[in-house]
Amino acid sequence: MEKKMTRRSWMKSSLTTLASLTAVSSLPTSLKGSIMPAKLLAGESSSSSSKVLMTKNISSDALVKIYEALGRKASGRVAVKISTGEPGGHNFLQPSLIKDLVQKVDGTIVECNTAYAGKRFTTEDHIQAAKDHGFFDIAKVDIMDSEGEFKLPVKDKKHLQYNLVGTHLKNYDFMINLAHFKGHAMGGFGGVLKNQSIGVASSKGKAYIHTA
């Protein structure tokens, strides 16, 4: 299905949760104590800072509650962006943790192939990796660049003119971003912004970003 998508409409339809959460002004009474607004750092103004919800309870129930506390319902065709994780490793969100939320929103787990040779470089291998890690047991899984990519324009063109994203991104109306914090040997870290930028880039798109 062809559907026109701009950078603005894509970002507006995306919901960031777990790793970085935009809070509603007040929490339901049932959630107080288990989920709390993050504290401001010294010198920060509440009027200029984003509100973030945090919880020490890392469980499927808490994940659903924090989603509900946002006050914005996922609607239409919902994509749930995760990292499927490298085969043989454990650095990915466990299906048991995200299952309740994914099924609550009737979401499809989405990913794109990697830019480097490995067990997630081809769609066939990537699907097998997702199966091995248990994601097919909880929801449908879509490798979004399995049928190519399209150019998504970017606003700041200092380094990039566009992002090459998986063509199946056009099939969704709403995206929930489930990212886990991960350190990288080259002095950086992966989180929500990476998961929703280079994470939805096709294999070619990832190479394009890395060489910009």
Where are these regions (language model features)?
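N-terminal and secondary-structure boundary signal
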Residues: 2-212
